[in-house]
Amino acid sequence: DIHGQLRDLLLLFKGFGCPDSANGVTFVFNGDFIDRGCHQLEVLGILLALKVMMPDKVWLIRGNHEDRAMNEKYGFKLACFSRLGHKFGERFFDVAQQVFEYLPLACLVSNRILVLHGGIGKGTWTLDDLRKLSLPLKESAMQPWIYNIMWSDPIEDGEEGLFGVHESPRGVQTSTFAWDVTKMFCARNGLSLVIRSHQSKMDSRGFDIMHEHMLLRIFSARDYEGHGNDGAVALLQDSPKEENMIKVRLQVLRSTTKAREEARIRDEAAKLKDGKGVTSKLH
């Protein structure tokens, strides 16, 4: 998730290189490019321009915020109107919705790693079911299993005794799924790992490794809605030592809120060490 946070998008390019650079990096952006952030139009414009220029180097996955109803509620429509005026803002907003309907719901990396925005829901669908979907895909035509790809969440590993599929607080159509569902889904589809996004966790490090190392949560927007969370990026590389092996390296994007607080604490500690700490008067 980027959620209109331009600084985090530019930080990714600074740290890993641009898609057209000599290092040959391919980027997968896992949905929720817009809503809530301060630079939604800039982020969307950059991503779409890169996709047009380098279609094999930039992949855009549809998230639950690539949706008209969500955009009308959580800020993208307002951003279009306030930045572009009513006439051009409305036109840009409508064109963006048409683009979203053509975005894929997932991508497959090296035939072993599935990247999707939300989750697997009941996990009874297959990769072939995904391949058979025709675009454009309107929300009104979405079956529950499709809807859950953008909306469902995993059950935390610490919640012992929970197996299978359960109702989600997100809504009637949405499910939560336990580790056994992930395990069976991966086995049925020949997968080693599912990478998903969708959830920001307050004060988190930006990623979670779950469900017996078969599920990875990645959330890239730092300090999302003031949560003080780190962001994270997953770097996938072929192993030079082992054939058909992919290394997954996780890079944390440090929360600026945390960094400032830690700097303040270090500064105060240094003052105390030098005898320059704040003194209080006792009465």
Predicted regions and their residues:
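Feature recognizes metal-dependent phosphohydrolase scaffolds
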Residues: 2-283
